[in-house]
Amino acid sequence: MTLSPSTVANYQQLGAVVLRNVLTASEVTLLTEGISHNLAHLSPLAQVASKADDPGRFIEDFCTWQNNPAYAHILRASALPEVAKQLMQSTTARIYHDHLLVKEPGTRQPTPWHQDQPYYNVSGRQNVSFWIPVDPVPLESSLRFVAQSHTGTWYMPRTFRDQQAKWFPEGALAELPPIDAEPAAYPQLAWALQPGDAVAFHMLTLHASAGVGPTQTRRVFSARYLGDDARHAARPWKTSPPFEGLDARLADGAAMDDFLFPLVNEVCRS
């Protein structure tokens, strides 16, 4: 898949773009099967990100692609690696990790405004996350982005349910601006999506989403890639997701050259 120059430019300038039909119908079917397998075999990293009194559940899981052939196929053999290289303007695409996000019908728990990269153990500007639903997603429950928020400031990462600082120490990074209170100052991007569509966004782009309606299930697979300039940013705390033993194998500032993060050298569509 070759992207238009305007799509690449919008990604670089705005920090998020929509990609229509980036997965084929057969790939959507395969991914749906992979999500079902993941939900039936949650990993030790899985968590419920909604509160106990929520009528639905917000389920997350991380880093299962090496044990899930459907996920591995999507990450390696779909159009995603080649699209990632184009968006990142990188000669390489390295798998960083996968992330499952499922909001069951009636889930009230929102996904609060945040950036992804402050939770991670990686530095560099060449990166991309794909947010890929296998269910139709109406605009009101789709992911929202603050345009151009990926260009500078790192904001304080906090837990979703109770806003605790479990990563950077309090005061180490800027607090979130009043995004929803001042919409004119923080223009937003969002798109309704169909299965096969994806949104691609930079790991520093501020994003959030609402809960879902009483009859809506929102099953999403996120695929994350790193480009040429990605480097290991060793942290004195447990990152989200954690990569146990990585600090012993990779020096701080080293390229992300580890078996956990393979380069995708060839792209083949099945």
For each predicted feature, which ranges?
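Generic beta-strand structural signal
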Residues: 91-93, 97-98, 109-111, 126-132, ...
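Glycine-rich phosphate/pyrophosphate-binding beta-alpha loops
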Residues: 116-118, 127, 207-212
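Double-stranded beta-helix
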Residues: 139-206
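Non-heme Fe(II)-dependent double-stranded beta-helix
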Residues: 1-14, 20-113, 119-121, 236
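Non-heme Fe(II)/2-oxoglutarate
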Residues: 34, 41, 45-53, 158-160, ...
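Short, structured patches in soluble enzyme cores that scaffold and shape functional sites
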Residues: 99, 115, 132-136, 145-147
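Short, conserved beta-strand element in jelly-roll/cupin
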Residues: 121-138, 192, 224-227
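Short, charged/polar surface micro-motifs in flexible loops or helix N-caps
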Residues: 80, 90, 105-107, 136-139, ...
